[in-house]
From Swiss-Prot:
A motif (Required for magnesium transport activity) lies at residues 339-341. Belongs to the CorA metal ion transporter (MIT) (TC 1.A.35.5) family. It comes from Oryza sativa subsp. japonica (Rice). It comes from the Eukaryota. Magnesium transporter that may mediate the influx of magnesium. Keywords: Ion transport, Magnesium, Membrane, Transmembrane, Transmembrane helix, Transport. One of its GO terms (cellular component) is membrane. GO terms for molecular function: magnesium ion transmembrane transporter activity. Its main location: membrane. This is Magnesium transporter MRS2-I. The gene is MRS2-I. It is a multi-pass membrane protein. GO terms for biological process: magnesium ion transport.
């Protein structure tokens, strides 16, 4: 594999050919290029140079701008595949791969994997492995690297979230505190954001799998070979590029039984198998997040039940205190009545009346309190 070199002149020439002389050039961005021969180069090119090199429009290139917020997207164009998968922003053609911001910490593992996967087969490899390598087009090998990288990245983030969330939720159920509640709140916010990112990647893969025409657009090598040789291997004309709707009605079972030199234009089985593998992987990641969300919801329900129980206990305490207050108020009422400085004759020479008043009033108030509590228990207003 050739060492990486900085090619600034090539980028400048491409930019001059793409833009008008009086127009302002776009800001240069760092790209790394891998070609089918296994060589890699670092390009410091502006957007006009990239647009001219891979033949895409400015709208497609804008999707790869890290300063703009675009959802995960896989676009098939005439000569390129535009990939925006989280931090992986790449353009794949039939002969080369351009990866943006190769020095980013999250992109470096992708660069290493592309360097390993796209290297030419060595002579020491088994013939079977070499044959399998040759069967897969260059753009599919590059696409597989990016899909594997993004699925592994999101899977790792999900695993990290699970390892932090489950202990925090268990701790919250055992002890409800402001610190634990704030910790779970932050974890739930992170889970919601991660769930949206995983869901978008999954939806993009599902959308591709549901549309055979979109998958056929990703066969860049086939389109390139068809443009160079418009006649199929059987000698007949190739009608499929002119009538894609007819080709989309052919069943997948019949596609494999009618190959041409460059492959049936409607045979998307190879790409379908590739996408299905990573669709299942990202779907498994989404299922983990769904399970975590359900666990969080169950924990919230459990905490709400605990809070309701504490609230009921406070209501019971309030009932006891209110009942006691009413009884004491009646007792105070009797004491207030007899404490008034009003002359009445029946109190003369009857000192024992004080004892009876105090005793009867106290017993009556106690009986009244017990009656209120017994009635509340009978109606189920307080626990047994």
């Amino acid at each position: 594999m050739a060492a990486a070199v900085v090619v600034a002149g090539e980028a400048a020439a491409a930019a001059a050919a793409a833009g008008a002389g009086g127009k302002k050039r776009g800001a240069s961005r760092s790209w790394i290029l891998f070609d089918a021969a296994g060589e890699e180069r670092v390009l410091d090119a502006d957007k006009y140079a990239i647009m001219h090199r891979v033949d895409i429009n400015a709208r497609d290139l804008r999707i790869l701008d890290p300063l703009l917020s675009y959802p995960s997207t896989i676009l098939g164009r005439e000569r390129a595949i535009v990939l925006n998968l989280e931090h992986i922003k790449a353009i794949i053609t039939a002969e080369e791969v351009l990866l943006r911001d190769p020095l980013d910490d999250n992109v470096i593992p992708v660069v290493e994997e592309l360097r390993r996967r796209l290297a030419p087969s060595s002579a020491t490899q088994h013939d079977v492995e070499g044959a399998e390598e040759d069967e897969s087009p260059f753009e599919f090998r590059a696409l597989e690297v990016t899909l594997e990288a993004i699925c592994s990245f999101l899977g790792a983030r999900t695993t990290e979230l699970e390892s932090a969330a489950y202990p925090a939720l268990d701790e919250l159920t055992s002890k409800i505190s402001s610190r634990n509640l704030d910790r779970v709140r932050k974890l739930k916010s992170g889970m919601t954001r991660l769930n949206a990112r995983v869901q978008k990647v999954r939806d993009e893969l599902e959308q591709l799998l549901d549309d055979d025409d979109d998958m056929a657009d990703l066969y860049l090598s086939r389109k390139l070979a068809g443009a160079a040789s418009p006649v199929s291997g059987s000698g007949g004309p190739n009608w499929f590029p002119a009538s894609p709707t007819i080709g989309s009605k052919i069943s997948r079972a019949s596609r494999a039984s009618a190959p041409t030199i460059h492959g049936n234009e409607n045979d998307v089985e190879e790409l379908e198998m590739l996408l299905e593998a990573y669709f299942m992987q990202i779907d498994g990641t989404l299922n983990k997040l769904t399970t975590l969300r359900e666990y969080i919801d169950d924990t919230e329900d459990y905490i709400n039940i605990q809070l309701d129980n504490h609230r009921n206990q406070l209501i019971q305490l309030e009932l006891f205190l209110s009942s006691g207050t009413v009884c004491l108020s009646l007792y105070s009422l009797v004491a207030g009545i007899f404490g008034m400085n009003i002359p009445y004759t029946w109190n003369d020479n009857h000192g024992y009346v004080f004892k009876w008043v105090v005793l009867v009033s106290g017993l009556f108030c106690a009986f009244m309190f017990v009656s209120i509590v017994a009635y509340a228990r009978h109606k189920g207003l307080v626990g047994s």
